[in-house]
Amino acid sequence: MTIQISQPPDSASRYLRWAAILFAIGFGIHGLDHLRRGMSASPPFVMVGGMIQGLFVVAAVVMALTQRPRAPEAAIAVGFGSAVVFTYAHLLPTFLPGYQDSFISPPHINVTWFSWFSALAEIGTGIVFAIVSMRARRSVEKASAPLLRLQPRHGVSR
């Protein structure tokens, strides 16, 4: 028995791939800003967390580009998760100094307009990645809905 998994319709799949590329670019720009600012500008927890998050970003982007069946779910989690984590880490005042690299609370080492641009680019592209993924997931569900409909058994009325 062969199980065939339906792919998202062309437009949803195409938008998901473009959103994945944009998110990868946003993540890369943010990484370049961390290199520009110097590795000592952020607490070690932020640097390690960013590297771990990078693994999730790569996985979600590769899944979207290769049209894996669970790519939309991964992209929703990684896109929204990244937006929330980076908003906390960079845009809010410092609550826990070892876990934040706040741009608005001191010491904000080497923070320039490019730092703000890179953080907002990553947050924005993360949100776009997640929203486009929600739409791609919905289109997959609509396309497979007739396949999931249960057939009535003999003698059972609906």
How should each PLM-predicted stretch be described?
Residues 14-28:
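Alpha-helical transmembrane segments
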Residues 55-66, 128-132:
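Alpha-helical transmembrane segments in multipass membrane proteins, preferentially the mid-helix core
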Residues 62-91:
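Loop-to-transmembrane helix junctions at the membrane interface
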Residues 37-45, 88-114:
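Interfacial non-cytosolic loop connecting adjacent transmembrane helices
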Residues 1-11:
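Short, Lys/Arg-rich, polar N-terminal cytosolic tail immediately upstream
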Residues 30-56:
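Transmembrane alpha-helix entry/boundary detector in multi-pass membrane proteins
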Residues 141-158:
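Short, highly charged, low-complexity non-transmembrane loops/tails of multi-pass membrane proteins
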